[in-house]
Amino acid sequence: EIGSGLVGSEMCIRDSVETDKFLLTSKLILTPFTSFILVSVIRKCIDAKRPYEKYNIKPLFIKETKGESMPSRHVFSITIIAMCWLYVSVPVGIIMLMLVAIMAASRVLAGVHFVRDVVVGFAVGIICGIAGLWII
């Protein structure tokens, strides 16, 4: 029968993939992906002004973006990547989380984010990482 060949192929493929590796790979791809979409939607909804918009200052980075300042997507992104590393290698994850501070400071000092933007970006990255990697 036609259908039985497809079922047999599916079983063969499923048996050849280690469930633990498949689950790990799925988590490491889907957690950042879905979290990034969530953060992008939150930014559009909040639409917070950036420091250079609010105080009419010139940012150190060439930036013409208006609004969408909170949460910081750069800080969120490096945080969620650090959480993925923490999930597979604690020492590397800890180093990556320390690097988040440098990224956060650079975004604030450059005048493209407020402190609250980077703190919220970090917090959302931690929460999404815990939820997507350890809880779900």
List the model feature ranges, each with a label:
Residues 1-8, 12-13:
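Single conserved hydrophobic/aromatic residue that forms the stacking wall/gate
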Residues 4, 30, 121-123:
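Hydrophobic H-region at the start of alpha-helical membrane spans
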Residues 14-38:
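Interfacial segments of alpha-helical transmembrane regions
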Residues 19, 44-52, 111-116:
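Transmembrane helix-loop junctions in multipass membrane proteins, especially transporters and channels
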Residues 32-50:
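Transmembrane alpha-helix/helix-exit interface in multi-pass inner-membrane proteins
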